[in-house]
Amino acid sequence: MNWNGDKSIKMNLDKTGKSDKTGTTNKNSGIKPNVKYNDILSKLDKYKDENIVPMHMPGAKRNKELIELYMGDMGNPYEKDITEINGFDNMHNAETIIKDAFDEAAELYGADESWYLVNGSTAGNMSAICGVTHKNDVVIMARNCHISVYNAVILNELNPVYIYPEYDEEYGYYKGITLKEIKDIVDKYSSDHDRNDIKAVILTSPTYEGNVSDIKSIAEYLHQYNIPLIVDEAHGAHFNFSESFPQSAVKCGADIVINSVHKTLPSLTQTALIHINYGIVDVERIRRYWNIYQSTSPSYILMSSIARSLSIVKN
């Protein structure tokens, strides 16, 4: 066997599995795995066995009954972990089973188009922002946006104009953005610049603490000036499934909405969705960046997890 690195190392294993180098070997494989590589798994096993209530993501909360009832047939992921082979479509050029999954998600959320994200909402935010802007464009964004929004601003060399959401001193969190705050910042910018320079407004709603912005009124106002609204709704993937929740940004008229299905729905970590409403945005340009920011080896296990979690909430 050959390993190529700073130095070339050769190990000649005989039929018994013995090596001409020092160290222990396994008669079956010839090499004994380094136990240090299992430290992460061992720590996860210990955490699972301690029966700690998980007040954190993902949304399944390690609920044994939920997992057995709805996820049991997913089985051993290693047995189903594949790449783009015949009959299994291709996420980057979806035409059959994956295209059907996208269409089902769009129908469920009421979007014109929905696509899976296996690189988290991060990939969705970056695809959306880069897909509606060009170098040196102006965007209005809430100062409490996710770091992925800032990364997109940096990568596309954009000029951000910040909205500073009101801070609640009593509870220690930022409130949602109001229509008045949007109008004020647009008017302020337009007093010295061309309003047409504003290529997008980017908001986080709900916030991590659950505060929502007035998305419906904001979207209606911005659309008067042909300004697209991007909503990072990572923590609101569940909004669409009960009248007890705030209305989803998709149904409120936002142009692009990103949901982390792993945050509040029973899907695996780093799974998410991007939804698009037709009218203002260039769908194909967004798709181009969606392809750029997604892995070229998308996990079928993660995609299956998204499909299963949506099936659960639908039924």
Question: What are these regions, as identified by a protein language model?
Answer:
Residues Y37-K43, N51, L69-M71, N93, ...:
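Conserved PLP-enzyme active-site core in the AAT-like
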Residues P77-S121:
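Conserved N-terminal alpha-helix of the aminotransferase class I/II PLP-enzyme fold
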